[in-house]
Amino acid sequence: MSSHPYVTQQNTPLADDTTLMSTTDLQSYITHANDTFVQVSGYTLQELQGQPHNMVRHPDMPKAAFADMWFTLKKGEPWSGIVKNRRKNGDHYWVRANAVPMVREGKISGYMSIRTRATDEEIAAVEPLYKALNAGRTSKRIHKGLVVRKGWLGKLPSLPLRWRARGVMTLMFILLAAMLWFVAAPVVTYILCALVVLLASACFEWQIVRPIENVAHQALKVATGERNSVEHLNRSDELGLTLRAVGQLGLMCRWLINDVSSQVSSVRNGSETLAKGTDELNEHTQQTVDNVQQTVATMNQMAASVKQNSATASAADKLSITASNAAVQGGEAMTTVIKTMDDIADSTQRIGTITSLINDIAFQTNILALNAAVEAARAGEQGKGFAVVAGEVRHLASRSANAANDIRKLIDASADKVQSGSQQVHAAGRTMEDIVAQVKNVTQLIAQISHSTLEQADGLSSLTRAVDELNLITQKNAELVEESAQVSAMVKHRASRLEDAVTVLH
């Protein structure tokens, strides 16, 4: 600690119920500090533990006060006084320090200090005294925390009760002897008076002083935390009851400390188990969160794919409807073609009939021409001109017959082709009808697929929303588990701190 620490002379007032507690080892290094002391001092627990306790000492405190405190504590006695401590930021606070040695197995193992708020009157009383002590301009000193005068008068407050009683008895004997001398009493009277005073003094010490010393000794054992048995007086008056009460208080404190220590150990074990379980739950919950988030991502991808498939199916449905309409129109066109081919076949048949008629006419004309030639030959010279005409007519009839035969052949060939074409057109018509029917079936299937895809999209959307809600719930659970882990860690820390505090008194 610096010989001139930074100070601001700014007072930090404490609440009435403020209690600061700390313990040190035999070399005055801090071994434990309660949360209130940590908060008021401005340091962290890690900064305080293992450090000398004078790190909170204010430079305005006189060295004589701490010298008196250590002198008293090392004698195994408690010390109480007003102390000005320094905070980490340089501010200060006033407390009434109650220090006591911690005795274990008859030996001092450390020191404990419990500090409460000092009143304004106490501060006003000691502040000028501390300044005077630092300046060396005072006739007073500090003895076991009390402000006393220097010299033999200052020793009177520290006299043991036994010597106080003896002093009073001696003073009474002197006064009595003076009275006897004044009345000129014989020497025997002096001796008798001396014996009476001695007997009274011995009786007073035996009946009053010694029991009070026992009470003080018992109370000191309770205050220092020393394990002890209850001392008893074979009397039931106020002193006997007081000693019993002090002893009972020590037993109750010991029972309370042992019970709390046992409970704290159970709480610590439970908090460790809870912390371990919470950590495992936190890990599992985090894995669940990751899995749910991965599921959400997969569901979103599936939803996008289903939406895309739904759009594709809808487009395919529209295309299938268009194709179905086109197929229907093609079927109607094919029906028209079939009808046209049937009409062509009928026309071809009629042409064949007409050709046959022309052929018959040519045949008849040829016969008539032959008959005319015969008649022209019979007529001689007069029938030559008619014979020439008859020859031409026969020639034309022959050509007509030949042409009719050629037309007949063409018509027969065309009729065969028309018949074949008609059969093919009818077959194509039937195929077109099948295509139209299949296209209608495909259209219906695509419509069903589109409807099913829409239903799947709706169902998947609902499932995605449910998974999203599950994700939110899982995340909230993860947050709750994290809060539980923090609370568990806090409980574990508090249990550890409480165990440390109980260990101080155990």
UniProtKB/Swiss-Prot annotation:
Gene that encodes the chain: aer
Species of origin: Escherichia coli (strain K12)
GO CC annotation terms, alphabetical: plasma membrane
Role summary: Signal transducer for aerotaxis. The aerotactic response is the accumulation of cells around air bubbles. The nature of the sensory stimulus detected by this protein is the proton motive force or cellular redox state. It uses a FAD prosthetic group as a redox sensor to monitor oxygen levels.
Segments on the Periplasmic side according to the record's topology features: 187-190
UniProt xrefs under PROSITE patterns: CHEMOTAXIS_TRANSDUC_2 (PS50111)
GO BP, one annotated term: signal transduction
Location of the protein in the cell: Cell inner membrane
Keywords: Cell inner membrane, Cell membrane, Chemotaxis, FAD, Flavoprotein, Membrane, Methylation, Transducer, Transmembrane, Transmembrane helix
Protein name: Aerotaxis receptor
PANTHER family: AEROTAXIS RECEPTOR, PROTEIN ICFG
Domain Methyl-accepting transducer residues, every copy: 263-492
The keyword Cell inner membrane appears for this protein: yes
